[in-house]
Amino acid sequence: MAEKLEREVFGTTKDGETVYRVEIKGGGLTAKIMTWGAVIQDLRLEGHDAPLLLGFDNFADYPAHSSYFGATPGRCANRIGGGKFTLDGKAYQLELNEKGVSHLHGGSDNIAKRNWTIVEHDVDRVVLKIVDPDGRAGYPGNCTVQATYRVHGNGEFSIVYESTTDQPTLANVCQHAYFNLDGRDDALGHDIMIAADHYLPTDERQIPTGELGPVAGTAFDFREMAPMERFEGGEQALYDHNFCLSKERTAKRSVALARSVNSGVSLEVRTTEPGVQFYAGFKLNVAVPGLDGRKYGPFAGFCLETQVWPDAINHQGFPNAVLRPGEVLRQETDYIFTKN
C-alpha cells in the first residue's frame, strides 16, 4: 500500500474547492503536482538550476493566465472542426469554445480546468482521478480519467492516462507541458528530432484538411536533429501541428528528442500514441511572471503533446478516437531527461 504523504494546500478554485499540491521525487527529478487540472506545476533536474517546464508559483495565476501549462486537457484533447461528429449514427454538437468555430481540448470547462482527486500518493508517484459527466460540453457518457505520474531512476518522468466510459464517446487526453531546457527567455536555442514522415496540414481554423503532408523537403522535416528555429521562404516557420507517428496505438517507442545547445539538457519522448503535436509556443504572451520570476513571451517553451490525431472522428483513415463501455483507453508517455 502506498505511503500516505503530506498534501500542501496550494489554492482555492472559484467554486471554493481546495487545490492541493504534492511532491514526488526520485532518479534526479523532483516534480510538484497540483490537483487542479492534474497539472505538473514544477519539474526540476538535479544539477540544473532552471525549471524544465513553464508554470507559476501561485495558483491564482493558473486559471487567469495559463495556456494549459503542465495540464491534462480532455476528455478529447486538441481540435474538432465545427464541434461536430457522428457516432453510431447519432449526430453530436459540442461547445464551440475556440473563436466560436471549433471545439478545443474538451470545452471551456474541460478536465484541465477542474479539480481532480488524489487516489494514491507515494514518494515517487501520485495517482489522480476525475469524472467528466454525461453531457458536459456536449459529450455523451460519464467518462472517468485516471492519471498516474511517476519518477524513475534514470531521469524518467512517466505518465499513464486511463479512461473509461458508460456510453460510447470520444476520448483522447494528453500532457500539455511547455518545456524549456535551458531557462532562457525563449526556447529557440534547442534542437529537435521527431520520428515522423508525415504531418497534418491544417486550414485557417487549425483543423486538419484530411491530407497527410510529407515532411521531406519541407520545414517540417525533423527526422534528424535540427534547430527548432527554421525559416521557409524567408519567414520563420511557426509550428502547431500534429506529426503522424503511426496509424494506431503501438507498444511504447522513442518518437522525439529535444536538446538545449546552451545547457546540455536533453529530453527524449517515448509513447504509445499515434501522434505528437509539436507547438513552438509562438503565441505565448503571459502578463505575469512564471516560475523563478521568468517572463513568458513568444517561444518561451515548446510542447510535444502525445495524442490521437486531431479531429480524428471526422476523417476516414485517421486513428481511432472512440471509447466504448467495457474498454480501457490506456495512453502512456515517458519524458526522459539527461544532462551532459
Language-model-detected regions and their locations in the chain:
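An exposed, glycine/acidic-rich loop-and-rim segment of catalytic or binding clefts
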Residues: A2-N340
